[in-house]
Amino acid sequence: MASTIERKTLEANEEPVDEVLQMPPSLLTCGGCQQSIGDRFFLKAIEQYWHEDCLSCDLCGCRLGEVGRRLYYKLGRKLCRRDYLRLFGQDGLCASCEKRIRAFEMTMRVRDKVYHLECFKCAACQKHFCVGDRYLLINSDIVCEQDIFEWTKLNGSIV
């Protein structure tokens, strides 16, 4: 389950009081190092407060408090997206090369077919597709707009 990370800031002109617990921040304890939090910036995740450097993935150690990062919490472990998918994601097979797609790999999906990024290319001319390119899915083969006529002539009907 993905969790949100709340970033808290204490402004110099504000009373240093936590909004939720009504406690002075110096009485807050970090969920990681168990030390008092006296920093101006701190995080709240998994119902605990954290120093920015203490909230990290339990497996790879990457910082989870950075902007754009997601925190996944499962079976008592704090995980980054990559490690969460590696442990709990589902693997599958590429519709083109039929090799394993690991759960953390980037993929392209067309209907019920899944492809490695490097396999998502025209079956006729081998050109990789860009955003906005038009193509046709014929069985598990992807054919670019320019090659559709030639492909169907050589390989039979579209349907």
UniProtKB/Swiss-Prot annotation:
<keyword id="KW-0862">Zinc</keyword>
<feature type="domain" description="LIM zinc-binding 2">
    <location>
        <begin position="92"/>
        <end position="154"/>
    </location>
</feature>
<dbReference type="GO" id="GO:0046872">
    <property type="term" value="F:metal ion binding"/>
</dbReference>
<dbReference type="Pfam" id="PF00412">
    <property type="entry name" value="LIM"/>
</dbReference>
<dbReference type="GO" id="GO:0030097">
    <property type="term" value="P:hemopoiesis"/>
</dbReference>
<dbReference type="GO" id="GO:0048821">
    <property type="term" value="P:erythrocyte development"/>
</dbReference>
<dbReference type="GO" id="GO:0005634">
    <property type="term" value="C:nucleus"/>
</dbReference>
<dbReference type="GO" id="GO:0031101">
    <property type="term" value="P:fin regeneration"/>
</dbReference>
<dbReference type="GO" id="GO:0061304">
    <property type="term" value="P:retinal blood vessel morphogenesis"/>
</dbReference>
<dbReference type="InterPro" id="IPR001781">
    <property type="entry name" value="Znf_LIM"/>
</dbReference>
<comment type="function">
    <text>Transcription factor that acts synergistically with tal1/scl in primitive and definitive hematopoiesis, and in endothelial development. Specifies mesodermal precursors to a hemangioblast cell fate. Hemangioblasts are bipotential precursors of blood and endothelium, and in the absence of hematopoietic induction cues such as gata1, tal1/scl-lmo2-induced haemangioblasts differentiate into endothelial cells.</text>
</comment>
<dbReference type="GO" id="GO:0003713">
    <property type="term" value="F:transcription coactivator activity"/>
</dbReference>
<dbReference type="GO" id="GO:0001568">
    <property type="term" value="P:blood vessel development"/>
</dbReference>
<feature type="domain" description="LIM zinc-binding 1">
    <location>
        <begin position="28"/>
        <end position="90"/>
    </location>
</feature>
<dbReference type="GO" id="GO:0030218">
    <property type="term" value="P:erythrocyte differentiation"/>
</dbReference>
<dbReference type="GO" id="GO:0043534">
    <property type="term" value="P:blood vessel endothelial cell migration"/>
</dbReference>
<dbReference type="GO" id="GO:0140297">
    <property type="term" value="F:DNA-binding transcription factor binding"/>
</dbReference>
<dbReference type="GO" id="GO:0001935">
    <property type="term" value="P:endothelial cell proliferation"/>
</dbReference>
<keyword id="KW-0677">Repeat</keyword>
<keyword id="KW-0539">Nucleus</keyword>
<dbReference type="GO" id="GO:0045944">
    <property type="term" value="P:positive regulation of transcription by RNA polymerase II"/>
</dbReference>
<keyword id="KW-0479">Metal-binding</keyword>
<dbReference type="GO" id="GO:0035162">
    <property type="term" value="P:embryonic hemopoiesis"/>
</dbReference>
<keyword id="KW-0217">Developmental protein</keyword>
<dbReference type="GO" id="GO:0032991">
    <property type="term" value="C:protein-containing complex"/>
</dbReference>
<protein>
    <recommendedName>
        <fullName>Rhombotin-2</fullName>
    </recommendedName>
</protein>
<keyword id="KW-0440">LIM domain</keyword>
<dbReference type="InterPro" id="IPR050945">
    <property type="entry name" value="LMO_RBTN_TF"/>
</dbReference>
